[in-house]
Structure formats: structure tokens, C-alpha cells
């Protein structure tokens, strides 16, 4: 079989590199495509994944997103026409879903983010199959126009794909000039350019005031910030300069989290990764909690707190008895993942059925 896979975000790079590796191992020919987007391009290079760049990220406003997507559909259609895949796979790529639909190629959509309404509306109705976490009810998807019978669920969280056999890179601490004898608090900024969060700036989230308070009250702590975009990186440098470690290029996130004492996330993937790796994890997600976040909070492996003062108190309490907090977290995670299945196996089976 010939299979086209579109990789648009760092999470998709981690997920689809494992999927394409498995498919290639089974004798299938894979075409990987991506777009011009700093974090993804750097991570693909870091992981040694070869992908053809087609089009670019639309940026932070709706008009730019629309134009970039329309242009990318045209460019991608030529690439897909040339490759002639039997099946197309994406994590709700609006461009690949539209191209596959237009060329009558079965499209397998992998998605764990029904809260991202814009991309769901543009992809889910055009998909032959939707592969998603069992933690998300089917009714969260059927409202987008896909029949329940076309939804296949797996009992796992997506990051389990690359975390279950994780081998952390021991060079990450040296690379970021961190001391493993001192506590490390890692902050991940939110997805401020995502269509579902447009209108919220970095300054409006708890991240900035929280980092300021941590620096003021805990001089023994090393602070690491992982920005998503150049604009976020510039803002952090302007405010903190060299008082914190700001990841200037894409880093191996799971390896950093492995050495992290406490994690504070404004998004989804790194928050889930951190929790599953047994790190005491806090979320300051700036909007209504999405399905996976609700699941993590319900199972008490993530604490949701947007108030900077309350969050600071909880971080301090965690750091005061860090070993106990990590032991408790690890025990909860162990109970949670013992029945997880491998999502890649489920997806491979569905893709091969369509071929």
C-alpha cells in the first residue's frame, strides 16, 4: 500500500513518526508531508524524520490562516496526485482531508481534540474513519457529522504512543545548562495562535505573573520556559532575559519532562506527557477544559488552577515534599496505564482494512 501522512504539529511528529515506522516495517510505502512551521521542522530534524515541506503555518489571524490553507490545498493536491496513495492519514489536517476527499482517497482522521471546532468541522465530516481516544465520548464527534459506526476508539491517551518505551536523552540537562541537584519547574505556554484560542495573548494567561512570583519566592528553583512561537519567545526574553532558561530551539520535550520536578502547562500535549511521566503536573489552560484535560483532572494526575496566587501555593506545597508528591503521582499513573492499549496497532489495522 501507499500511504500519505500529513504532520502539522510537534505532537503529530511524535505520534506519526511511530505510525509511519510501523507501517514501513509492514512493507508499506509512506509519503510524509509537513508545512513551514518552526517547532515542527526543528523537531522533525531532531528526530531524524524526513518529510516534504508543503505550504506554511497561517499565523495568528483568521485571514492569514484562510489564505495559507487555501494555497496549501492547491500545492498539496499536486503532491498527492503525483504519489497516488491508497489511503491518507492526518491528525485533522484541513488540507489533506480536503485533497483526499476531492481525489476520492479514503482519509483516516486521528484526533483527540473535539474542542478544536474549526479543524474538526473541516475534517471530520470528510473522513472515512475517525480514530480517537476512548476517553472522549462518541457524541463529542457525531455533532460534526460523522456516523458513530465510523468512529474507532482505543483505550489510551495519545502520548502513550511515544512514552511507553521512552529512553530519555541524558544530554538534555547539559544542553539547557541545568543542575539536576536543584528543583526544575518547566512552563509550557499555551497555543495562542490556535483558532480555538484566538484573542488570548501570553500576557493574559497566568504564566508570566506565576514565573515572576516563583523567581521572587524560590531562589533555589530553576525555571524553564518552552515557548511555541517566535513571538512568545521574544516576549519571554524581554520580560525575563537570563533569569530563566528559555528554550530557543525545539527540545526533546519528554526528556526534559523526565528531569522536571514540577510542570505547569497552558496547553494539552506536554501536560498529558508530564502527568504520564509521573511529574506533579498543573494546568493553567486559559479556556473551558477540553475532554482529555477533564479526564486527567478527574483521575487526579493533573491539577487545574488558573489563579496565579493559588497555583503558587500549590507549587510551593509540592516542592516542600517533592518525593512524596512524585511517589503519589507515579502510583496513580501506574494504575491508570496498566490497561492501556497501543493506539498504533489499532490505527494500522484500520488503515490496512481500507487498502
Predicted regions and their residues:
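Donor nucleotide-activated moiety binding/catalytic core segment of transferases
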Residues: 72-76, 230-266
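Catalytic binding pocket for nucleotide-activated donors in carbohydrate/polymer assembly enzymes
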Residues: 276-317
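A donor-sugar binding/catalytic signature common to diverse glycosyltransferases
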Residues: 88-99, 109, 255-293
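Catalytic donor nucleotide-activated moiety binding site of glycosyltransferases and closely related
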Residues: 47-60, 211-247
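A nucleotide-sugar donor-handling region in carbohydrate enzymes
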Residues: 131-202
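A conserved, positively charged/aromatic
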Residues: 108-110, 120-132, 257
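Conserved donor-nucleotide binding/catalytic region of nucleotide-linked donor-dependent transferases
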Residues: 317-333, 353
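Conserved nucleotide-sugar phosphate-binding/catalytic loop shared by glycosyltransferases and other
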Residues: 24-69
Amino acid at each position: 500500500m501507499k500511504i500519505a501522512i500529513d504532520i502539522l504539529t510537534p505532537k503529530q511528529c511524535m505520534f506519526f513518526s511511530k505510525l509511519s515506522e510501523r507501517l514501513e516495517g509492514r512493507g508499506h510505502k509512506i509519503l510524509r508531508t509537513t508545512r513551514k512551521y518552526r517547532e515542527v521542522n526543528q523537531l522533525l530534524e531532531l528526530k531524524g524524520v524526513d518529510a516534504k515541506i508543503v505550504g506554511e503555518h497561517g499565523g495568528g489571524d483568521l485571514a492569514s490562516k484562510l489564505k495559507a490553507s487555501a494555497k496549501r490545498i492547491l500545492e498539496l493536491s499536486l503532491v498527492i496526485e503525483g504519489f497516488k496513495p491508497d489511503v491518507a492519514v492526518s491528525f485533522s489536517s484541513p488540507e489533506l482531508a480536503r485533497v483526499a476527499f476531492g481525489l476520492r482517497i479514503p482519509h483516516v482522521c486521528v484526533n483527540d481534540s473535539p474542542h478544536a471546532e474549526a479543524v474538526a468541522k473541516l475534517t471530520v465530516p470528510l473522513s472515512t474513519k475517525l480514530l480517537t481516544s476512548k476517553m472522549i465520548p462518541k457524541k463529542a464527534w457525531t455533532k460534526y457529522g460523522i456516523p458513530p459506526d465510523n468512529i474507532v476508539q482505543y483505550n489510551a491517551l495519545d502520548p502513550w504512543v511515544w512514552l511507553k518505551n521512552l529512553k530519555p536523552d541524558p544530554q538534555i540537562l547539559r544542553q539547557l545548562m541545568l543542575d539536576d541537584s536543584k528543583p526544575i519547574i518547566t512552563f509550557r505556554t499555551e497555543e495562542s495562535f490556535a483558532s480555538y484560542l484566538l484573542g488570548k495573548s501570553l500576557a493574559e494567561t497566568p504564566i508570566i505573573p506565576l514565573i515572576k512570583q516563583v523567581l521572587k519566592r524560590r531562589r533555589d528553583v530553576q525555571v524553564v520556559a518552552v515557548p511555541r512561537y517566535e513571538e512568545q519567545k521574544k516576549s519571554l526574553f524581554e520580560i525575563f532575559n537570563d533569569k530563566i532558561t528559555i528554550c530557543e530551539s525545539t527540545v526533546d520535550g519528554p526528556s526534559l519532562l523526565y528531569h522536571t520536578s514540577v510542570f505547569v502547562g497552558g496547553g494539552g500535549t506536554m501536560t498529558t506527557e508530564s502527568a504520564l511521566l509521573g511529574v506533579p503536573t498543573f494546568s493553567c489552560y486559559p479556556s473551558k477544559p477540553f475532554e482529555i484535560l477533564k479526564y486527567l483532572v478527574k483521575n487526579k494526575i493533573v491539577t487545574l488552577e488558573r489563579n496565579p496566587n493559588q497555583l503558587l501555593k500549590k507549587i510551593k506545597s509540592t516542592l516542600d515534599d517533592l518525593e512524596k508528591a512524585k511517589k503519589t503521582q507515579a502510583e496513580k499513573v501506574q494504575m491508570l496505564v496498566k490497561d492501556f492499549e497501543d493506539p498504533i496497532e489499532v490505527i494500522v489495522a484500520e488503515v490496512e482494512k481500507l487498502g
